[in-house]
């Protein structure tokens, strides 16, 4: 696979212009082009009367090796980097303990999803309600000033970002392309495919609710659990051979979960949990 960068086209170009520019840039016949995808699309608006689109394309041809050799000195034609996500582990066949994720905001949601995809069958605990019930409680506060302290704009499935405007960009460098995994999961859950390549991807609040539900369903399909209105009120830490080790979680309901593996994805507002 080849990566072509610095591809410039008019703002209102025709769809077929992309294929044509690939053929011209690589100097190949149409039958040698297998496929191409847009990896990134941005704007060059430095001249307001001549705004252009800037593309980065991933291209597969029948002559990849020959073309890489021929364009060896061209900085805008290189081999495409591997952007596939590499799981750090796979669960053993006999799982002695299930990991627990506390909180189901963005961090907890993806922690639960990735653990489930690796076969660890996680238990995700969320002190708030599932996203649609939580939406009712949140709008109840905004419109009627009725506050549910456990289900609001901060607590509940999806986290605080559920009621944001759904923008998906940051200033964080991502050399290993972890964000690609996130965006791919969003697309599988119903986000528009263009978030994979536009410079400032945006989903929108109303799509987020359905997407969060689909991602939760995926955790269940892979053997995990998601439990709502399950606040963690205490943790037990034991001394094992001179080392401190978490051993139990006690829920507000009184239930005790024995586990040595916990991801605290509690956001910035669960201050009662911070004090444990």
Locate each region found by the language model.
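Residues forming the flavin
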Residues: 3-51, 57-276
């Amino acid at each position: 696979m080849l990566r072509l960068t610095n591809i410039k086209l008019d703002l209102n170009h025709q769809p077929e212009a992309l294929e044509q520019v690939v053929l011209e840039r690589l100097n190949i016949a149409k039958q040698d082009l297998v496929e191409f995808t847009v990896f990134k699309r941005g704007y060059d608006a430095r001249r307001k009367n001549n705004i252009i689109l800037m593309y980065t394309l991933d291209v597969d041809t029948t002559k990849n090796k020959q073309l890489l050799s021929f364009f060896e000195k061209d900085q805008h034609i290189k081999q495409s980097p591997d952007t596939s996500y590499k799981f750090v582990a796979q669960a053993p066949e006999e799982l002695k303990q299930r990991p627990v994720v506390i909180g189901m905001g963005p961090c907890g949601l993806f922690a639960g999803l990735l653990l489930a995809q690796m076969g660890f069958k996680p238990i995700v605990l969320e002190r708030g309600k599932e996203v649609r019930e939580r939406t009712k409680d949140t709008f109840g506060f905004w419109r009627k000033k009725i506050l549910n302290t456990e289900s609001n704009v901060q607590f509940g499935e999806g986290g605080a970002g559920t009621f944001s405007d759904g923008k998906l960009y940051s200033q964080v460098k991502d050399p290993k392309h972890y964000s690609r995994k996130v965006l791919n999961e969003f697309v599988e859950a119903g986000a528009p495919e263009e978030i994979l390549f536009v410079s400032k991807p945006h989903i929108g609040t109303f799509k987020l609710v359905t997407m969060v539900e689909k991602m939760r369903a995926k955790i269940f399909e892979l053997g995990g659990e998601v439990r709502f209105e399950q606040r963690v009120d205490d943790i037990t830490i034991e001394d094992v051979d001179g080392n401190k080790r978490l051993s139990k979680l006690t829920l507000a309901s009184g239930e005790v979960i024995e586990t040595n593996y916990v991801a605290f994805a509690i956001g910035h507002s669960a201050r009662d949990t911070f004090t444990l």
